[in-house]
């Protein structure tokens, strides 16, 4: 047994998990359950009443958090302690949205001052592009932005830009490129005019394979349209810490925005990585995004565990993964603008908590990060919701919906809400055999067939869900929502005693990909790897099967 599983609270939860009643019974026992098990913070309301949890469950979960020293770990992250122990780094994405007067010291430097300088630089740049002062090489204003990145430098800007579509200023269009598949960038460049296109390249090292390959192809396209090398500076900017490589590429040093080691890619949209967002919605809205996240930071840092929204969500996820063998978690967004959030949260959670070794190098003997997946309502109801209702796997769900739509036409939004709330009720309540049979009472079917069909219409219920509501989707509420999931991810990793801020599996994939690339471009067939890899490489070299 590991240190975690030996904790008294862990062992108490293991015993308690076998005695929790069906949620139908819990709602009968606790008529005021919604009032007792919902909380508001930062413009969000969390209803967690539809969980397999009694008051005793909550007490035990918070006891585990306290026994795991969660509060101390939260404070250590905010203080800039080196909690990323495998890379010897602080973890300070929270500093990216801290107010100007905040002081956070990293190796003798107040990083908040550096962040504010970068935000001011972004503001000047965004203003020059959106007002038309920034001119392309033929004197025309910029109309299109192509954002080139991968991972966090792609997903964050893309999903936030998509979510904030109602706040676009209208001066620019933005196109996001990540995949190294040439089709991706070719399709994005179709119809663009090199004279009015600005490229934003995001890579800390200015050497990430996918990002550099796509940027070089973008540059080739740009030059092929009649531009020259000296024109590159008017159409390419970078977010990178490698100024030398960026300037060698042709980017003006004044148009290189910094990145820092204390920010991981999946937590970086709040930095200059978010430049495409700012170009689309303006710096005022970008700062509102930061303000919403900062408000959630304060809530996470200062609120007691029992009413702390990220803690509640993180502990429930752990509850199902470790004591009910839940292997996945679904995020369901009932707002079209938020349709990309499940993919963003997927990277955030799975890259952070997809670990099997504790901070001190011990193999874990408990489940860690679940598979995160999902989509937008109501589309999912006609696809995978069937599995949620009647499948054999337990899949906890998060439902996310604004109470007010940006596009309130006809009965659309009330129907959307009815589906959202109806799904949470159906998952919790289910349908018994007697209820299903009663529904068939007026049918002319023979009794034997009614019995058969009723059996197929039974739904066990007791399927847990959280519901997150906001008055309206705004930059502020979006910032708070994303920060909520960041901190929820931290809570789980802190309890599991893993490092949520490295990604060695990703690094191995890069390394082996480069090894294979060498063999794909070699003069002779591959013979030195396993037989499967050798065969696949050689088939590719032959261009046929």
From Swiss-Prot:
Q: Which residues cross the membrane?
A: none
Q: Which UniProt keywords apply?
A: Cytoplasm, Gluconeogenesis, Glycolysis, Isomerase
Q: Name one Pfam family in it.
A: PGI
Q: Please, one GO biological process term?
A: glucose 6-phosphate metabolic process
Keyword Transferase recorded: no
Which is an annotated GO molecular function term of this record? carbohydrate derivative binding
The protein's annotated catalytic reaction(s) are: alpha-D-glucose 6-phosphate = beta-D-fructose 6-phosphate
Gene3D superfamilies assigned: 1.10.1390.10, Glucose-6-phosphate isomerase like protein, domain 1
Q: What class of enzyme is it?
A: isomerase
Chief location: cytoplasm
Spell out the PANTHER family in the cross-references: GLUCOSE-6-PHOSPHATE ISOMERASE
Q: What is this protein called?
A: Glucose-6-phosphate isomerase
Q: What is the lineage of its organism?
A: Bacteria, Pseudomonadati, Pseudomonadota, Gammaproteobacteria, Alteromonadales
């Amino acid at each position: 047994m590991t240190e975690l599983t030996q904790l008294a609270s862990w062992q108490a939860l293991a015993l308690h998990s076998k005695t929790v009643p069906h949620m139908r019974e819990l709602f009968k026992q606790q008529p005021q359950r919604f009032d007792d098990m919902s909380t508001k913070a930062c413009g969000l309301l969390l209803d967690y009443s539809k969980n397999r949890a009694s008051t005793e469950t909550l007490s035990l979960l918070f006891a585990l958090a306290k026994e795991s020293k969660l509060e101390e770990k939260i404070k250590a992250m905010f203080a800039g302690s080196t909690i990323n122990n495998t890379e010897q780094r602080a973890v300070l994405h929270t500093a990216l949205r801290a107010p100007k007067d905040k002081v956070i010291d990293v190796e003798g430097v107040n990083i908040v001052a550096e962040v504010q300088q970068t935000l001011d630089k972004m503001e000047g740049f965004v203003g020059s592009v959106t007002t038309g002062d920034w001119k392309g090489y033929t004197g025309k204003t910029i109309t299109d932005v192509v954002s080139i990145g991968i991972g966090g430098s792609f997903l964050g800007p893309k999903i936030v830009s998509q979510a904030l579509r109602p706040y676009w200023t209208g001066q620019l269009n933005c196109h996001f490129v990540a995949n190294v598949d040439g089709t991706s960038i070719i399709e994005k460049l179709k119809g663009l005019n090199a004279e009015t296109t600005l490229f934003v390249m995001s890579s800390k090292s200015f050497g990430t394979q996918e990002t550099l390959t796509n940027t070089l192809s973008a540059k080739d396209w740009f030059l092929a349209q009649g531009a020259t090398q000296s024109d590159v500076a008017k159409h390419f900017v970078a977010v990178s810490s490698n100024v030398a490589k960026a300037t060698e590429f042709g980017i003006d040093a004044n148009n290189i925005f910094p990145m820092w080691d204390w920010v991981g890619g999946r937590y970086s949209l709040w930095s200059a990585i978010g430049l495409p967002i700012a170009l689309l919605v303006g710096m005022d809205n970008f700062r509102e995004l930061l303000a919403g996240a900062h408000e959630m930071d304060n809530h996470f840092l200062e609120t007691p565990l029992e009413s702390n929204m990220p803690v509640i969500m993180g502990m429930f996820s752990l509850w199902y993964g470790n004591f009910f063998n839940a292997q996945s978690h679904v995020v369901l967004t009932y707002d079209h603008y938020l349709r990309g959030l499940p993919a963003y949260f997927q990277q955030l959670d799975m890259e952070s908590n997809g670990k099997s070794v504790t901070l001190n190098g011990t193999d874990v003997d408990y489940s860690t990060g679940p598979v995160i997946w999902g989509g937008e309502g109501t589309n999912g109801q006609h696809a995978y919701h069937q599995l949620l209702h009647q499948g054999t796997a337990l899949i906890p769900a998060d439902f996310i919906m604004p109470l007010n739509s940006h596009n309130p036409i006809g009965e659309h939004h009330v129907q959307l809400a009815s589906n959202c709330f109806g799904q949470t009720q159906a998952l919790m309540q289910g349908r018994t055999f007697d209820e299903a049979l009663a529904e068939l009472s007026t049918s002319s079917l023979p009794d034997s067939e009614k019995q058969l069909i009723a059996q197929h219409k039974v739904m066990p219920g007791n399927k847990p869900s959280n519901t997150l509501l906001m008055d309206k989707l705004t930059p502020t509420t979006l910032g708070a929502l994303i920060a909520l999931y960041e901190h929820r991810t931290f809570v789980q990793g802190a309890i599991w005693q893993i490092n949520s801020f490295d990604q060695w599996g990703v690094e191995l994939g890069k390394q082996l990909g480069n090894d294979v690339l060498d063999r794909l471009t070699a003069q002779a067939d591959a013979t030195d790897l396993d037989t499967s890899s050798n065969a696949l490489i050689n088939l590719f070299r032959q261009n046929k099967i």
